[in-house]
Design a protein with these regions (language model features):
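A composition-driven surface/loop motif
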Residues: 29-369
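Compositionally biased alpha-helical segments
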Residues: 1-29
Length: 369
């Protein structure tokens, strides 16, 4: 700590104007190097920064709404650890270097915007601390894209649980790819005004548990970016874990939707719905189901609806699986029930290639290879 000419005070590399300081609190609380701890309570929030990263970070706290901006000169990964509860709080991070976000028993409901808003285009590793329960709810109004938004690419890990409630739009959204690692515990989408997960570039699930319910649009929607050279652009890749999507009574929606290839090589997928015109799985290109992960996948789809807007320009028929190009089935088990009028289990506009596995439903294909 340096006191200079009675006008400034420098602490841990940051200089403050004396006239702007109304109090100084000194305590013995340790903060791990490279870490920022944000502790919420209904009355507000407190931010604790490690000395090695404090010079590069600027924090703003208004009630329990916390915003932290990382300077361009930051060249180390910071771990932001959120804990505590607030019925009117949020967390926003802005920066340009990869970071870690640890949810360590945090419960936030925002009255203005997203509950968590990461305006950082780099890799964001989200860790659900083992044994913790976390919950996020955004405001019912505002311009936010999701309750939990990541501008860059998100990677989820950690054995805790996270419940998301999207009151304005999506429950979770990322501008670039999203991955669920094998160490993941459970992410539960309780409800969303639009999609449960809305992901740019690609979605990869290697393990853990993802449950999506109460959505008024698609369960998982993966959109290709505008850059055709982006890796796995528009794809879905599922090699493990348990994915459960309940579309409920929403009409003309999809459980799992992708702009490009969907590859399912492991895991257990269950999709249910009772609205009209629903699609359990919908790909704009090809579908590949095999056991390349070493464990054969199981797909169970039950859609009880019929045709949406029958006879209209936007008519949509119920389909368990709809493939715009080719479908290759080479391992696993597929069970589909679509008992409604005009509904079908699997429709393939291109070629259907059967190699191995158990499929307990009819396949309607333009060509059988």
């Amino acid at each position: 700590m340096t006191y200079d000419n009675g006008t400034t005070l420098t602490v841990a590399g940051r200089t403050y104007t004396i006239a702007d300081i109304d109090s100084i609190v000194v305590n013995s609380r340790p903060v791990t190097a490279g870490q920022v701890e944000v502790s919420y309570s209904n009355g507000g929030a407190r931010v604790f920064m490690a000395g090695d990263v404090a010079p590069y970070l600027t924090a703003s706290v208004s009630g329990a709404h916390v915003s932290i901006t990382a300077a361009a000169g930051l060249t180390q990964e910071v771990n932001y650890v959120l804990s505590g509860t607030s019925s009117d709080g949020s967390f926003t991070q802005t920066g340009s270097y990869k970071m870690r976000l640890t949810l360590q028993g945090v419960d936030l409901t925002s009255s203005s915007g997203a509950a968590i808003n990461v305006q950082n285009g780099k890799r964001i590793k989200v860790v659900l601390a083992d044994g913790t329960t976390n919950a996020l709810t955004d405001a019912a109004s505002g311009s936010q894209k999701a309750c939990f938004y990541v501008r860059g690419h998100a990677e989820f890990a950690g054995g805790g649980t996270l419940t998301l409630t999207g009151r304005k739009a999506h429950a979770f959204a990322s501008g670039e790819y999203t991955e669920l690692h094998s160490s993941l515990g459970h992410i539960y989408v309780a409800s969303a005004v639009t999609d449960g997960f809305h992901v740019g570039q690609y979605f990869r699930m290697a393990g853990g548990k993802l449950t999506i319910a109460g959505v008024k649009s698609d369960g998982i929607d993966v959109a290709a970016t505008n850059h055709s050279t982006d890796e796995n652009n528009g794809q879905v890749m599922i090699s493990g874990g348990t994915l459960t999507i309940a579309l409920d009574a929403a009409h003309d929606v999809k459980g799992l939707k992708a702009d490009s290839l969907i590859t399912i090589s492991g895991g257990n997928i269950t999709i249910t719905g009772m609205g009209n015109g629903q699609k359990g799985i919908k790909t704009a290109t090809n579908l590949l189901v095999n056991n390349a992960s070493g464990t054969a996948p199981t797909l169970t789809i039950t859609l009880t609806g019929t045709t949406y807007n029958k006879g209209q320009a936007d008519e949509s028929k119920t389909r368990g699986i709809k493939v715009d190009r080719d479908f290759t089935f080479d391992g696993g088990t597929i069970n589909i029930s679509t008992p409604g009028p005009k509904a079908k289990a699997i429709v393939v506009d291109g070629t259907y290639y059967y190699k191995s596995g158990t499929i307990n439903c009819p396949v309607s294909a333009a060509i059988v290879g």
